[in-house]
Amino acid sequence: MNAIWIDEQLETSARVQNSMKIEREDHKLEKRLCREVGRAIVDFNMIEEGDKVMVCVSGGKDSYAMLDILLKLQKRAPINFELVAVNLDQKQPGFPEHVLPEYLSKLGVPYHIENQDTYSIVTRVIPEGKTLCSLCSRLRRGILYRVAGELGCTKIALGHHRDDMLQTFFLNMFFAAKLKGMPPKLVSDDGKNIVIRPMAYVTEKDLTRWAQVQDFPIIPCTLCGSQENLQRKQVGNMLRDWQKQYPGRIENMFSALQNIVPSHLMDSKRHDFKGIRTTGVADPEGDKAFDAEEFMQAAPAGRAVIGINPLAPG
């Protein structure tokens, strides 16, 4: 009897300790997410005093997490800014229209649902079997720009993360022959909106875990999510394989996006190769043309490069 009682006590104690460990890990994850989003906001001056930020919420894990983190930072930020969540209901068959309004109402955040049947347009114009993403994205972009103006928003926040940015860089290199990525902040192509990506420093792995912790009511994208062999998926798999084989490579590649040397590429629009002249003065930072390149064995890249104070201590 005593042995059974002791076993039960030990089992209960183990469960309590495991629960406490999970809580600690979840708290660390929350702090890391807030810190990394805060750093991006500060690094690129994404949100300023008096801004009204339109937070685009699709129903996926990334946009849910972005809204959640921005709400947390809003409470502790040294500046005042507004948030309004916006969802574009594209009238996809089976789309659960009630999910987002119920979630956002419960959250207590101002929100707007824009109803536009882009689904019919995309499926009518794009041949069966072809990727729908490009046209869908263009239609969605135009609508969201208009809505931002109607709501008086000064910034549009998108939920792209670090992995998205790296994938875009390689997609442009492989399929468009461009060294072009996904900027953390830009002026929209209509010249009227500033678009920000507050989760530029956040990993998809952390977002996946946070979605589980918060139990977000995820809405799958049935319009394009079922299409296999998309180029982005292929590039994503390639990057994940690299990271498994060479841990730290993803961090180094991401840091490289912030450490560009135009004079060592081949774009004459970015560097005046034709006008190069000798100066007769030694430059310790100059190029050693005949020396082999020296590379770090392991660079702590990623977070060391972006170590700037977030909006508030966390």
UniProtKB/Swiss-Prot annotation:
Catalytically driven reaction(s): cytidine(32) in tRNA + S-sulfanyl-L-cysteinyl-[cysteine desulfurase] + AH2 + ATP = 2-thiocytidine(32) in tRNA + L-cysteinyl-[cysteine desulfurase] + A + AMP + diphosphate + H(+)
GO cellular component: cytoplasm
Disulfide bonds: none
Miscellaneous note of the record: The thiolation reaction likely consists of two steps: a first activation step by ATP to form an adenylated intermediate of the target base of tRNA, and a second nucleophilic substitution step of the sulfur (S) atom supplied by the hydrosulfide attached to the Fe-S cluster.
UniProt record similarity statement: Belongs to the TtcA family.
PANTHER family noted in UniProt: AMINOTRAN_5 DOMAIN-CONTAINING PROTEIN, SULFURTRANSFERASE-RELATED
Entry protein name: tRNA-cytidine(32) 2-sulfurtransferase
Organism: Polaromonas naphthalenivorans (strain CJ2)
Gene encoding the protein: ttcA
